[in-house]
């Protein structure tokens, strides 16, 4: 189960490791001024690699599915769907129960965490609360961008995939949890921020955003920055 570009590295690992897979993704949507029908990156990947795919429905029952793996999927499974398809796991990009919710990678950078990781857990009716079957940590350096962390996590999943026991009953998550939020466009604005916070936001939002500021009534999008030891300031790009 996947629906955006962040799903593809995980889909690639599973495709290269399993004899047979079927991908479930979201239907095309109409977008832009011309309201053209646009397919998502996962559907494009499936078509390019001759992978069977289906469109998601909350009413679907996948009787031939041994296990299901969700990676960056845009839908929340209903209780009825979970009951009918009860062997589905999610790949969450944090060390659960820390940083539950929609923005764990970005929040880890904003929190100045020194490490994060990924968690594979059995999906239940709540959000990111199911029994954990596998976790692996990765480091975060002070100059890492979100894009670096996404790549590091998918590489770690690829390296550890064969070690994940999907038949495991898993372990309950502890009660010491934290949650992330869905960011709004206003959160990407660094105009009033200190230098330290601005730099942190630029790194955290280079995929989701980017960060921006304004100058002479123009919006300036900032994807990255560089610092020179002999410079009087920072160069934003």
Specify the residue positions occupied by each region the protein language model found.
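One-carbon transfer enzymes
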Residues: 1-213, 218, 227, 235
């Amino acid at each position: 189960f996947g629906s955006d570009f962040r799903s593809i590295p995980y889909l690639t690992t599973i495709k290269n490791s399993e004899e047979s897979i079927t991908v479930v993704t979201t239907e095309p949507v109409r977008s832009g001024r011309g309201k053209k029908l646009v397919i998502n990156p996962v559907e494009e990947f499936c078509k390019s690699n001759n992978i069977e795919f289906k469109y998601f429905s909350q009413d679907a029952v996948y009787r031939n599915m041994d296990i299901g793996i969700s990676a960056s999927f845009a839908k929340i499974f209903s209780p009825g769907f979970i009951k009918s398809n009860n062997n589905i796991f999610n790949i969450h990009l944090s060390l659960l129960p820390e940083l539950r919710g929609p923005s764990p990678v970005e929040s880890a950078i904003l929190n100045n965490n020194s490490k994060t990781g990924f968690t594979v857990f059995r999906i239940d009716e709540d959000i990111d609360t199911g029994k954990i079957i596998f976790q692996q940590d990765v480091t975060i350096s002070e100059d890492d961008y979100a894009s670096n962390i996404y790549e590091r996590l998918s590489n770690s999943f690829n390296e550890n995939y064969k070690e994940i026991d999907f038949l495991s009953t898993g372990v309950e998550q502890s009660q010491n949890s934290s949650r992330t939020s869905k960011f709004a466009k206003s959160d990407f604005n660094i105009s009033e921020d200190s230098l330290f916070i601005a730099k942190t936001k630029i790194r955290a939002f280079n995929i989701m955003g980017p960060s921006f500021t304004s100058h002479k009534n123009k919006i300036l999008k900032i994807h990255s920055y560089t610092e020179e030891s002999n410079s009087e300031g920072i160069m934003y790009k």
